[in-house]
């Protein structure tokens, strides 16, 4: 019998994957000194809305993935790590949102640069923390005997590579793009969860 939770979670993961490239592009535009203050604020607000929507959809899908592992396969090995990622990403989105809007309101100049730097440091630290935990999650998932129709391992690999990109900081945009593939694989796992029965060898 089809579980609507997994179907909804799949579409949320797809939504997050679709919004992520647009958010990345708008974030670059918002960081560029183009146009007047109102234009900068408009771009920043648009990036904020799309970025927040992508993050919310992605986090809900991640919560459902944890539920899928818990309920269908009795696996709880990444529960605490997923909780950490959810909390940290929520804080990161909030800090980035406040910083982006404040910088846009200030406009172009030394004050804007100083303000941006004040927000960049915590954002980088939070990104590194998320990257490290993503690597650990990926490694744990790679150790599972059951591959959930050959999708766990690709998801784990994307998690490790994207996490490494965030840890390296300079490759963070690449890591963000890899989240698109990660969410697509996650969506496929949700869709296929309704097509198969739990497998007892999942440990």
Predicted features by range, described:
Residues 37-40, 44, 116, 120, ...:
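Membrane-helix interfacial "entry" motifs
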Residues 1-35, 39-97, 126-164, 180-203:
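Membrane-interface extramembranous regions at the lipid-water interface
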Residues 104-116:
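Membrane-interface interhelical connector segments
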Residues 93-107:
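Membrane-anchoring/interfacial helices and their immediately flanking loops
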Residues 120, 124, 164-178:
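Short hydrophobic membrane-inserting alpha-helices and related fusion/pore-forming segments
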Residues 113-130:
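A loop-to-helix transmembrane entry motif
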Residues 31, 107, 170-173:
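Short helix-capping/hinge motifs at transmembrane helix termini and TM-loop junctions
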């Amino acid at each position: 019998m089809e579980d609507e939770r997994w179907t909804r979670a799949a579409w949320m993961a797809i939504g997050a994957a679709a919004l992520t490239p647009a958010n990345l592009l708008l974030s670059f535009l918002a960081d560029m000194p183009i146009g007047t203050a109102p234009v900068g604020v408009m771009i920043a607000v648009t990036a904020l809305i799309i970025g927040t929507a992508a993050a919310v959809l992605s986090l809900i899908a991640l919560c459902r993935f944890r539920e899928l592992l818990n309920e269908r396969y009795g696996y709880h090995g990444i529960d605490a790590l997923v909780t950490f990622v959810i909390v940290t990403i929520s804080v990161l989105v909030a800090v980035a949102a406040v910083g982006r809007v404040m910088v846009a309101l200030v406009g172009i100049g030394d004050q804007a640069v100083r303000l941006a730097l004040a927000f960049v440091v915590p954002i980088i630290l939070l990104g590194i923390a998320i990257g490290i935990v993503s690597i650990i999650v990926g490694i744990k998932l790679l150790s599972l005997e059951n591959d959930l129709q050959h999708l766990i391992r690709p998801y784990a690999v994307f998690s490790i590579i994207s996490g490494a990109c965030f840890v390296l900081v300079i490759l963070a945009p690449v890591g963000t793009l890899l989240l698109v593939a990660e969410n697509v694989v996650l969506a496929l796992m949700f869709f296929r969860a309704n097509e198969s029965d739990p497998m007892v060898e999942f440990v």
